[in-house]
Amino acid sequence: MKTTVQLYDTTLRDGAQAEDVNFSVEDMVRVAKKLDQFGVRYIEGGWPGSNPRDVEFFKEMRRVKLRKAKLVAFGATRRTKLKASEDPSLKALVASGVLTATIYGKSWDLHVLKALKTTLDENLRIISDSVAFLKKHMDEVFYDAEHFFDGYKANAEYAIQTLLAAEAAGADCLVLCDTNGGTLPNDLERIVTNIKRRIKVPFGIHAHNDSELAVANSLAAIRLGAVQVHGTINGYGERCGNANLCSIIPALKLKLGIDCISDANLSKLREVSRYVDELANLPHRKRQPYIGDSAFAHKAGVHVDAVVKNPLTYEHIIPERVGNKRRILVSDLAGKSNILQKAAELNIPLSTNSPELITILKKVKQLESEGYEFEGAEGSLELLMLRAGHNYESVFNMFDRIDYRILTERRKVDPHPVSEATVTVEVGGNIEHTAAWGNGPINALDKALRKVLPKYFPGRGLENVRLIDYKVRVLTAAEGTAARVRVLIESGDGTNKWGTVGVSENVIEASWQALVDSIEYKLLRTAKKN
């Protein structure tokens, strides 16, 4: 087996074809710089000449000096009625300013005859002419054998002839593409084993995930000798996506012993994943292997007890190797080990002999039976654990009362309903009313609460707190409009983020609970810093 594999990232080209992914030119430049810092060998930047954005990207990248990565221009073989030297697409690759190009060509006779509408022999000449032309002008030319595995199944000898045509013309690497993503690993292994006997130049793998096998197929090809693996960060790609480099890289490094990236850069894998998610404006996938929030999250009490004693019992790698960390979840499935481990994470003094331990465990189980969920609301969980002790006093105890009232009205002059929230606080007989308008009752309530409280907690940063996310889930749908609901909110202050939760038959009351917890958690964090 190879001791190293070339990482070829196509996030900016194939990944950008994914539904809901839209990179600006600035985004593309930032992603390219991040991938270079991360240690990727090749960065496929797009198809120069096919659209203004990719043209502008390659223009901008002329000003960027990459440390180690090579920028790759992507394109297609020449058109059927043009010479390679006259083809606009091939000329655009040469004019892109980079020295490495990847072009795709037809491997499947069905596509040659029905899509390209030419003869099988002419397709071989198209491949040969295109590769040969680019080799005269560029240092490296990679040939993507589009639909190779489907083509091989339909007409094995012809599919191989397309590879040999590219090889004879000077292609530096023949990339076998499972373009439709339907090939099974056992079929891939059989086909790759056969074609290895016929080709002399290195080969690579480009797998799509339509059968949830892109990573498995990529690893299978590498075990059989592939020297280059194509993929995208987070598996972005058309339809069901491409092979996920965030899964391939740690599998190569930690399980197959293939040194495709440095240890230091491997520890930045989660950071890179989240960085690209942010630029793509997509949520982070909690259940993504290796780097997702749930990848090393433990919920069952027996599992937690075991993993604390020996992480190997329920963790296949050390989370920190990929920049992740273990999370202990507290729920109605929790045992004492969960509570103790979570308390240790939060620096809350708690031991097996602490009387609060049983109190906390019972409270968690009771609240979750009522519909509370603490897995996304660790701010509320920390407050719950502190309230179980005798030394914690809520900051809201200073108020003799803190009430709210909300009015929502639809007026002819307004295109949408507007809400007004009034918060009343009383301290030592002094009563203060504060009101705020908002786009909906919860937005108004949030504004009113944050408007009145800074007066009582000056210098504690409440002015910076913002509601980032708000989710409502109906827990007892059978009861219709009287159903119990759970509100989960995420708040942030520009530096940190935290989640809190509330449950009630009234969505506004559930929201109030979560908002109050959010403010109290912020005040708690600020007090600990000071």
What do the predicted segments below correspond to?
Residues Q17, D27-R30, Y372-W498, G502-V507:
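Non-catalytic terminal/interface segments that mediate subunit docking, oligomerization
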Residues T4-V5, T11, P250, L256-H433, ...:
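A mid-to-C-terminal "edge-of-domain" accessory segment
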Residues L12, W47-P48, G75-R78, G105-W108, ...:
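Short, ordered loop/turn segments at secondary-structure junctions
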Residues A207-I233:
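Small-aliphatic-rich amphipathic alpha-helix that forms the alpha element of a beta-alpha
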Residues R67-F74:
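A glycine-rich helix N-cap at a beta->alpha junction
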Residues V21, W47-N51, L120, F149-Y152, ...:
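Hydrophobic alpha-helical scaffolding
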Residues T495-N530:
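Mixed-charge, glycine-accented linear interaction segment located at domain edges/termini
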Residues T3-L7, D14-I43, F58-L66, R79-F203, ...:
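Alpha/beta enzyme core
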